[in-house]
Regions:
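An intracellular "coupling" helix at the cytosolic face of ABC transporter transmembrane type-1 domains
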Residues: 120-121, 137-146, 150, 154, ...
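Membrane-integrated ABC transporters
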Residues: 1-44, 59-74, 92-96, 100, ...
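Juxtamembrane loop-to-helix connectors within ABC transporter transmembrane domains
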Residues: 96, 100, 114-161, 219
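ABC-type nucleotide-binding domain
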Residues: 344-592
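Helix-loop-helix
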Residues: 60-62, 67, 166-180, 250-323, ...
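Transmembrane helix-loop-helix hairpins at lipid-water interfaces of multipass membrane proteins
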Residues: 30-88, 168-173, 284-288
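Alpha-helical transmembrane segments of multi-pass membrane proteins
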Residues: 42, 81-100, 151-158, 179-205, ...
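Hydrophobic alpha-helical transmembrane segments of ABC transporter permease domains
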Residues: 24, 35, 88, 136-181, ...
Length: 592
């Protein structure tokens, strides 16, 4: 996994440029929103001058009578300014919220599309939780950062510059004093921001790791309980949780310093204005209205620095999230298949492996499949057996084109699968994996997943073939019962449902990866009979450690260390007394 804590300033700048490029269709409307934010800030700046004018009108009228009409005119003008400023702020917030919501919608859509385009090696090197964190947490963080922080920074900057100008116009000596104090605070903020970026990156990455671990442990919580591994899980979770806590603490500590710091700076500026302003007023250099205006200007002058600091803090978090998002979006994709065939004549099911050599992309020096060759005739049931790590599942993954081979060729009916699109290859197979996959939906929806025109008669037929008919009929709504936590369903029943789904797909070839590893003996017999019917006339590849389930296979390929060391049917291999016979006998010795 990439280490984001080593991200450079250039990478963060690059991430923000990519965000701008990503939003290029909305640049115009975003510019309007930012202009409105600046206008709202500028209108606010006029307020203190008018308040000072009202103060002078009141002070001058204490002896001769207050000009209430003049006070009313200034007051109405002041109210109109504040209302207009609030209106501009509301409009820009609405615009930014709309734009960023559309951006996050598009970004999540692109991330969803990307998931189907990245090679398998990406999923092997990144946890599911980390990928999910990019799609959910990081996109939300980026959206919130752009919605709130960017306009805040622009309006605060406009307010800062406008206040500075008005302060010099009103009284340059007080402006210099305020500027000196504020400049010192600004220097401290810039220094803190430069030191805090890595902690925001740490926070996002540590959160992704925590999400990944929680997802893994939740999906395997039964194994954790059975293995009495709760204490180890708790300990490891505690370490990850502490890392998230520490990263958040450091980032929040540094960002939390900024607002109190600006409050201190602002209060010092207030004191300086009051002391030196009073001296100038007593000397007759300025009026008390100027002091009132200046006190308000100091508040408006220092508060933008805190807003800018907080906005920059949020933008740092947003840019860290953007970096993680674009790291995924710009990751390597599957090779282009526009020139490959998406159609194939009627599939018979002849499969040929010729001198296949393969190593995983992340470990090119570690060869998994060394020199695999085999001929499988149409309609044969082929069992691939061998010890763990022999290359059984890898061979099936290569057949399905989940990975590309280093050398050699794999052909179906004489056509190399490298010349066919992946979708074409996948459509040739039905597949039952070790890990059952069911989603929260009805039994019907789970069985007919991505298939159309499946009748109830077909559902009844496959369920009866798998021995599921009685189970389905006992459910409250039958096929329309929603599978959720409230519906008690065993591991064996889940396995049967996935096998029934494979039956419905009715593909010309079949892959069974440990299909009966999680069912009892009686259910295994039911499945075995159903599979015998299903595999009849279809080329079938069965991966199983329980060798008793593949005695009726037409061809058994015995693998060890990436090579096929024996081949033949059960009787031939047992008579040979080789490695297969050793594996077979060892299982029965263990059982006895």
């Amino acid at each position: 996994m990439r280490k984001y804590e080593k991200a450079s300033k250039g990478e963060m700048t690059s991430a923000m440029k990519k965000i701008i490029e990503y939003m290029k269709g909305s640049v115009g409307i975003v510019a309007v929103a930012l202009v409105l934010a600046a206008l709202g800030a500028v209108l606010t700046i006029i307020g203190p001058d008018k308040v000072g004018e009202i103060t002078d009108l009141m002070a001058d009228g204490l002896m001769t009578g207050i000009d209430l009409k003049a006070v009313a005119r200034v007051g109405i003008f002041l109210g109109a300014i504040y209302i207009s400023s609030s209106l501009f702020t509301f409009i820009q917030q609405y615009i930014m919220a709309t734009v960023t919501l559309k951006m996050s919608y598009r970004m999540r859509s692109d991330l969803s599309r990307k998931i189907n385009c990245v090679p398998q090696k990406y999923f092997n090197s990144h946890s599911q939780g980390d990928i999910l964190s990019r799609i959910t947490n990081d996109v939300s963080t980026l959206q919130q950062g752009l919605t709130n922080s960017l306009p805040t920074i622009i309006s605060a900057a406009a307010q800062f510059v406008g206040c500075l100008i008005m302060m010099f116009v009103t009284e340059w000596r007080l402006a210099l004093i305020s500027l000196f104090i504020t400049f010192f605070g600004l220097f401290l903020i810039v220094f803190i921001m430069s030191k805090s970026q890595k902690f925001f990156l740490d926070r996002q990455e540590s959160l992704g790791k925590l999400n990944g671990y929680v997802e893994e442990m939740y999906s395997g919580h039964e194994v954790v309980r059975i293995s009495r591994g709760a204490e180890n899980v708790k300990k490891h979770f505690g370490g990850l949780n502490e890392a998230v806590y520490n990263a958040n603490l450091k980032s929040q500590f540094l960002s939390g310093i900024m607002q109190p710091l600006m409050n201190v700076i602002g209060n010092l500026a207030y004191v300086a204005v009051c002391v030196f302003g009073s001296m100038l007023a007593l000397n007759g250099t300025i009026t008390f209205g100027v002091i009132i205006s200046f006190i308000l200007y100091v508040r408006l002058f220092t508060s933008p620095l805190g807003q800018i600091a907080q906005g920059m803090t949020n933008m740092q978090t947003a840019s860290a999230s953007a970096q993680r998002i674009f790291d995924f979006i710009e990751s390597e994709e599957l090779s282009d298949e526009s020139g490959k065939s998406s159609e194939m004549p009627e599939v018979k099911g002849n499969v040929s492996f010729e001198n296949v050599r393969f190593s995983y992309p992340d470990t090119p020096d570690k060869v998994i499949i060394k020199n695999f060759s085999a001929e499988v005739k149409a309609g044969q049931k082929v069992a691939i057996v061998g010890p763990t790590g022999a290359g059984k599942t890898t061979m099936v993954n290569l057949l399905m084109r989940f990975f590309e081979i280093n050398s050699g060729s794999i052909s179906i009916d004489g056509t190399p699968i490298s010349q066919l699109s992946r979708e074409t290859v996948h459509n040739m197979f039905s597949m039952v994996l070790q890990d059952t996959w069911l989603f929260e939906g009805t039994v019907r929806e789970n069985l007919v997943y991505n298939m159309e025109g499946i009748s109830d008669e077909s559902l009844e037929r496959v369920c009866k073939a798998c021995g599921l008919d009685k189970f389905v009929h006992t459910l409250p709504e039958g096929f329309d019962t929603v599978l959720s936590e409230s519906v008690a369903i065993s591991a064996g029943q889940k396995q049967l449902l996935t096998i029934a789904r494979a039956m419905l797909q009715n593909a010309p070839m079949l892959i069974l990866d440990e299909a009966t590893s999680s069912v009892d003996t009686r259910t295994e017999l039911l499945i075995q009979r159903a599979m015998d019917k299903l595999t009849k006339g279809r080329t079938s590849f069965v991966i199983a450690h329980r060798l008793s389930t593949i005695k009726n296979a037409n061809l058994i390929l015995v693998m060890r260390d990436g090579d096929v060391i024996e081949s033949g049917n059960h009787e031939t291999l047992m008579a040979k007394g080789g490695f297969y016979a050793e594996l077979y006998n060892s299982q029965f010795d263990q059982a006895s």
